[in-house]
Amino acid sequence: MGFPRASGILLHISSLPSEFGIGDFGPASYLFIDYLKSAGQKYWQILPIGPPGYGNSPYNCLSAFAGNTAFISPKLLAAEGLLPKSFAKPRADGIAAAAAARIETIRPAFEIFKQTSNEQLKAEFRRFCDENGFWLEDYALYQVIKSRSGQAAWINWEAGLRDRDEGALAAVRRNEEDAIEREKFFQFIFFRQWDALRRYAAENGVGIIGDVPLYVAHDSADVWASPRNFKLNEDGTPRVVAGVPPDYFSKTGQRWGNPIYEWEKMRDEGFGWWIMRLHFNLRLFDAVRIDHFIGFTRAWEVPGTDKTAENGRWAAVPGRELFYALGQALGGLKFIAEDLGDVTPEVEALRDDFGLPGMRVLQFGFGGDAGNIHLPHNYVQNTVVYTGTHDNETAVGWRMARRKGGGAGALKHCLKYLDSDGRQIHRDFIRAVYASAGNLAIVPMQDVLGLDNRARMNLPGTIGGNWEWRCKPGDFSGKTAKALRELSELFGR
């Protein structure tokens, strides 16, 4: 799939302005779509919207299908009569506390729903449960057991539940029927609010780009419900986990800890789980960015008991067969290949043979020679180009860091290349990617606003302080919208 020549903004749902401490699908999300339209932007890119697990990372979710119920808007629930007009509005510091407070705020909606006379809403709920039973039943059960087990990982549950003994699961279904139904209800509300938001975006000419991580967390409903899809020991512990080998930046490599797929079994079964997963996501989004695309050619398998990634080994992945099966089943591959990192000829061939646009990041272009693929004069049309991603510094922060510390050569190269004095480096970055040949240019909202690294979304390899940044109510201004629209028109986006 290729994109038309266009531009868009990267802003996660949690980063929308909110009086509750975390963004949601409420009025601010509709206001942002209005802003995108007025700014001449055709796309809104977000991060994964699943329920986050360890570290609150959206890339480490408890399910490959479920939604993060902290994104449910209390205001929209109240407007439907599913919360009192004067619902509680607790304030919380930090995204984890804000998410927990949000879930408590919306909890009464389930009891109100059970008493409602709105038969149409009840019918919608039943239809949602029927259509999504292939993941919803296991996810609701997983969440209820996890809650009653003190949030312990499934590997630490009592043996009968851990190993999915039918008698043990039947007892939970019988004793926790109401709690299971509540989990299903809030998933119903999540996707109902999301569908309404996406319809509004489409009506205003804005496409939404989602994000799918390659791997799932070990402590997830997917691994618990379908252990045969993963390389696990008899007791459910991972035989091997994902990571990357030692390199210049890390002498011991990186041990991510995600279980590795049983690719051979998945291939023998026609890649059914992958087809379901990506079909599900393409119902939610206009296109999907696939994280760690290079992992579809080979995986660095680290022994599950090792503390570092030093003793890993490369294992082949049948990516070509997978994408052929996806193309046959889905009728089109509306994907962006996140092909950053150690890109081998095999990765390039897989990307190009299936016509997938890759990624280029302007920040990575400076400090080397003119052949750097991240410099705009080297971009090709079937590419999505960024000033930076959620893992990068902001443009302003990038300049400040190189003025104060190392990287002076990269900054000098940057300023010369962009013919810039650096005072409005974020605008220079935006202009450079807009002017490039890459069909789709995406700019993080932090760069639109010219913010420094205090607004950085994520610092890879660290825990704490990430995923916290949020827009302020006045950030969707006519001034920045006008500037973006003028650039979009100037460069035919």
State each model region's role:
Residues 37, 194-202, 327, 351-352:
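Surface-exposed amphipathic alpha-helices with a cationic face
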Residues 183-216:
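Conserved, well-ordered alpha-helix/loop/beta-strand core segments that scaffold catalytic motifs
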Residues 2, 27-52, 284-285, 433:
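Catalytic domains of carbohydrate-active enzymes, especially glycoside hydrolases
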Residues 8-33:
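N-terminal catalytic cores of NTP/NDP-binding nucleotidyl/phosphoryl-transfer enzymes
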Residues 469, 473-493:
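Terminal-tail/helix-coil boundary detector
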Residues 2-5, 10-12, 18, 56-191, ...:
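Alpha-amylase-like alpha-glycosidases and glucanotransferases acting on alpha-linked glucans and related
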